[in-house]
Amino acid sequence: MQELLTLQPIVRVNGTIHLPGSKSISNRALLLAAQALGKTCLINLLDSYDVRYMLDALHKLGINYCLSIDRRSCEIDGIGRPLRVDTALELYLGNSGIALRSLVAALCLQNKNIIITGDKRMKNRPIGHLVDALRQGSAQIHYLEKDNYPPLLLQGGFYNGDITIDCSLSSQFLTSLLMMAPLASQDRCIFVKGRLVSKPYIDMTLAMMKSFGIVVQHDQYKIFYIKGKSQYRSPGHYLVEGDATNASYFLAAAAIRGGTVRVTGVGSNSIQGDIRFADILANMGAIIRWGVNYIECTRNSLCSIDIDMNALPDTAMTIAIVALFTYNGVTTLRNIYNWRIKETNRLVAMATELRKVGAIVVEGKEYLSIKPPNMFKIAKINTYDDHRIAMCFALVALSNVSITIVNPKCTYKTFPDFFKLLKGISIT
């Protein structure tokens, strides 16, 4: 039987949210620290399903670490070299895209048989562009069920020089190559084919690699120059920023039904591109204030917007909900075709669920247009086991109707405390 959570109408939000660690940073930091020379203490690590999958995989790969009781700090004994195993094994990564993809690349530098797999949805998320690039470097990779999708059998072999990667579907393919390439035996260039989606995530990856001692040069994100036979070095302590994507839900709540909400743990100096969500809210009319370690949002009249969201696909979903509360016209989110290969087909799912609450929605191949409802409808929201759909549609409770979320615990993928924190700033 499916679990349901009904949220009653929220009259006002006000308060401060201390953000848990970023999922994207947490999993990158774990992999970098594991391969770095020296011991690294990760602070404000996220405790979620995606991070636990990465930790479990690293344990199976022989990495020693010690978690604090609350799992928010982790001390890792880095091995100072690429990951290796003494025997064949299988790694299960659930539906964690960054964990699975980054480990696929990292484990092409060793020569034991390793099977990498995930849940049903992960087996329908394409990985062919990454596999094609790794095979250019002589990596031995075999599809075990259907071409271009996990599960995969890895047999090592990555060696040869320059490679070309298609990043039109996911920047995680390039991130995976960038983090692996310095540990390979040769210098190389990585050429980016086509349009690079979600470019801010590449900036995040490069900033984190720099913190672990590796600097990568690039030419306008088209060519990346990697020095081989390099070594990651522990920074000693590494602070995981609060999750800027998850901050978007609370900033949006304030823009819709504030009061004022401040999110802490992320601010003007963040390495996360999703902090730019606050600028989009400001362009829609919200009042935004910045600090080094916080972003604050106060309610104001919100207008519709027509915007290319290719760089910020996750927070584009939050904008789709904000669009329900605008006072004029239609909001159009463009260039979001890669929504279709996320945790679910988010273009179809968002269009379907937005219509349930009364919006008039046009779903194109690469865009979504949303006209606010004349009157909000009480609805039961299918989440498709997608954490972001659950969190986005919780904000519909900021209207004058209740909203029911199916399978609310899907948020445990990246934000187990989401509903608790939302309740803490809400007046019903």
Curated annotation (Swiss-Prot):
Q: Would you tell me the Gene Ontology cellular component terms? A: cytoplasm
Q: What is its EC number?
A: 2.5.1.19
- Annotated localization: Cytoplasm
Q: Which PROSITE patterns match?
A: EPSP_SYNTHASE_1, EPSP_SYNTHASE_2
Molecular functions per Gene Ontology? 3-phosphoshikimate 1-carboxyvinyltransferase activity
Listed SUPFAM superfamilies? EPT/RTPC-like (SSF55205)
Q: Which UniProt keywords apply?
A: Amino-acid biosynthesis, Aromatic amino acid biosynthesis, Cytoplasm, Transferase
State which gene encodes it.
aroA
Record's protein name:
3-phosphoshikimate 1-carboxyvinyltransferase
Biological source species: Baumannia cicadellinicola subsp. Homalodisca coagulata
Cite the binding residues for phosphoenolpyruvate. Answer: K23, G97, R125, Q172, R346, R388, K413
Q: Assembly state and interactors? A: Monomer.
Query: Where does the record place the catalytic residues?
Result: D314
Q: Which reaction does it catalyse?
A: 3-phosphoshikimate + phosphoenolpyruvate = 5-O-(1-carboxyvinyl)-3-phosphoshikimate + phosphate
Q: Which family does it belong to?
A: Belongs to the EPSP synthase family.
Q: Does the record carry Transferase as a key word? A: yes
Q: Where along this sequence does the record place binding of 3-phosphoshikimate?
A: K23, S24, R28, S170, S171, Q172, S198, D314, N338, K342
